[in-house]
Amino acid sequence: MTSVTDRSAHSAERSTEHTIDIHTTAGKLAELHKRREESLHPVGEDAVEKVHAKGKLTARERIYALLDEDSFVELDALAKHRSTNFNLGEKRPLGDGVVTGYGTIDGRDVCIFSQDATVFGGSLGEVYGEKIVKVQELAIKTGRPLIGINDGAGARIQEGVVSLGLYSRIFRNNILASGVIPQISLIMGAAAGGHVYSPALTDFVIMVDQTSQMFITGPDVIKTVTGEEVTMEELGGAHTHMAKSGTAHYAASGEQDAFDYVRELLSYLPPNNSTDAPRYQAAAPTGPIEENLTDEDLELDTLIPDSPNQPYDMHEVITRLLDDEFLEIQAGYAQNIVVGFGRIDGRPVGIVANQPTHFAGCLDINASEKAARFVRTCDCFNIPIVMLVDVPGFLPGTDQEYNGIIRRGAKLLYAYGEATVPKITVITRKAYGGAYCVMGSKDMGCDVNLAWPTAQIAVMGASGAVGFVYRQQLAEAAANGEDIDKLRLRLQQEYEDTLVNPYVAAERGYVDAVIPPSHTRGYIGTALRLLERKIAQLPPKKHGNVPL
């Protein structure tokens, strides 16, 4: 049934149409103006008010909030769907449910699309999909980052297989753009079905707490098929994808927080893989490193506890090495490893660091995959990698073994070995066994390896090694009735003094320098300047076979 308000609006529209003479130049301009005004609110002001009542912005307002003021240039604003099935021909709103175009963020060009959930629930139809494909291709062609603001509910069922075909074209473009231009997805509402795969193919996914959801099948379908009851937030909310699935890279407190994060993220990324990341002007230190030490540098000399089993927060190291802020990625997921962006002497760097406060810094499946993904992202976009190592090994347990720690842990090996960007490693404390190899070892292709005097580089820790190295001696002592615990402690100390230090590795060239912790920032800065002109080539190949 048509409301009185709707009838009045239609009458006014017909009246306006009657007053426009489209056979004159003035009339043609008036017609254009009318259509452009209509495209701003394709389904009316009531729909806009409902969006605002939920504390959310409209698709267009989100673009304005993210981009520089007055920089947005819209494309295909007058596009309409072509379907006539199920009476769709009677409702053909301009734009077809997605706003596309380009603009600037902090003066840098970006391409963008924003899905409009007020039009057919944000469902994807043929024209809707064509608009996204078009702006994707524009971003690839011009070498500009692509930002997708997602708020849609799957395929437009009334348009049939054509919707699925457009999904496939969008996915393929995501793949073609991968490693060529940065792709960032914001999830600003419920994204279901086919709508979730495109964000998953992009470089970064940002969600909003208590507002965003992502899932393949919703709660109703799950209950019907499995009998399991779950809410939308539990199934696919920001916390779920941040802490459990690892799909989200940041969980924002609100829409503006999400936009601020995107702006900061882009400040570390180049527009495409053929250029370098933005670099801020910073005066290079002159003179010896020890003459340029700050109070923050000196604090590193007392940061590592005397006991090798006492944890410390690796963030305390990271913040003292960087110029200013540390933009952490996936902070709530696999917290035994820390990854994110920062700057040293104005140069963007990617930080990969073990976190001793979680699982003692051990690598597990999730940490390996998180770090591997981040390393590949840095390598795609020419961002040097700095590894901070304090790793006692891979996390033991049947759960890890059964779920594929061998194959999935190898992803980090593969990512690091394949990366050709400058690679710098700092061993702060433990670097044991296979985890030593994985975390930026010299023979895995690291360019500059540094170690602190507190570094412990060995096949394994003293407590485990003594049982192997001194097995016969311990057995004989036990047979003679000696104090085994006292002997074991003495042998552990002997093992630590002999092998568990940075100097054996330094003697053999596996470590380039053993340095005071306070000198770390200075050494990294000089290494970054040296490696600016690094030339590295991989053997010709179609592509490698990552252990997926």
From Swiss-Prot:
Protein's name according to its UniProt entry: Biotin-dependent acetyl-/propionyl-coenzyme A carboxylase beta5 subunit
Pathway membership: Lipid metabolism; mycolic acid biosynthesis
Activity regulation annotation text: Carboxylase activity of the AccA3/AccD5 complex is stimulated by interaction with AccE5.
PROSITE patterns per record: COA_CT_CTER, COA_CT_NTER
Domain CoA carboxyltransferase C-terminal: 295-541
Residues of the CoA carboxyltransferase N-terminal domain: 25-281
GO biological process entries: carbon fixation; lipid metabolic process
Catalytic activity: N(6)-carboxybiotinyl-L-lysyl-[protein] + acetyl-CoA = N(6)-biotinyl-L-lysyl-[protein] + malonyl-CoA; N(6)-carboxybiotinyl-L-lysyl-[protein] + propanoyl-CoA = methylmalonyl-CoA + N(6)-biotinyl-L-lysyl-[protein]
Keyword hit for Metal-binding: no
Region annotation Disordered: where it falls in the sequence: 1-23
Source organism: Mycobacterium tuberculosis (strain ATCC 25618 / H37Rv)
Record's function text: Component of a biotin-dependent acyl-CoA carboxylase complex. This subunit transfers the CO2 from carboxybiotin to the CoA ester substrate. When associated with the alpha3 subunit AccA3, is involved in the carboxylation of acetyl-CoA and propionyl-CoA, with a preference for propionyl-CoA. Is also required for the activity of the long-chain acyl-CoA carboxylase (LCC) complex.
Induction trigger: Expressed at higher levels during the exponential growth phase.
Family: Belongs to the AccD/PCCB family.
Assigned keywords, A-Z: Lipid metabolism, Transferase
GO MF term set: acetyl-CoA carboxylase activity; identical protein binding; propionyl-CoA carboxylase activity; transferase activity
Catalytic activity, EC: 2.1.3.15, 2.1.3.-
GO CC terms: acetyl-CoA carboxylase complex; peptidoglycan-based cell wall; plasma membrane; protein-containing complex
InterPro entries linked to this entry: AccD/PCCB, AcCoA_carboxyl_beta, ClpP/crotonase-like_dom_sf, COA_CT_C, COA_CT_N
Pfam families documented for this protein: Carboxyl_trans
Subunit structure: Forms homohexamers. The biotin-dependent acyl-CoA carboxylase complex is composed of AccA3, which contains the biotin carboxylase (BC) and biotin carboxyl carrier protein (BCCP) domains, and AccD5, which contains the carboxyl transferase (CT) domain. The AccA3/AccD5 complex forms a dodecamer, and can associate with the epsilon subunit AccE5 (Rv3280), which stimulates carboxylation by the complex. Is also part of the long-chain acyl-CoA carboxylase (LCC) complex, which is composed of AccA3, AccD4, AccD5 and AccE5.
Superkingdom, taxonomy of origin: Bacteria
Compositional bias of kind Basic and acidic residues: 7-21
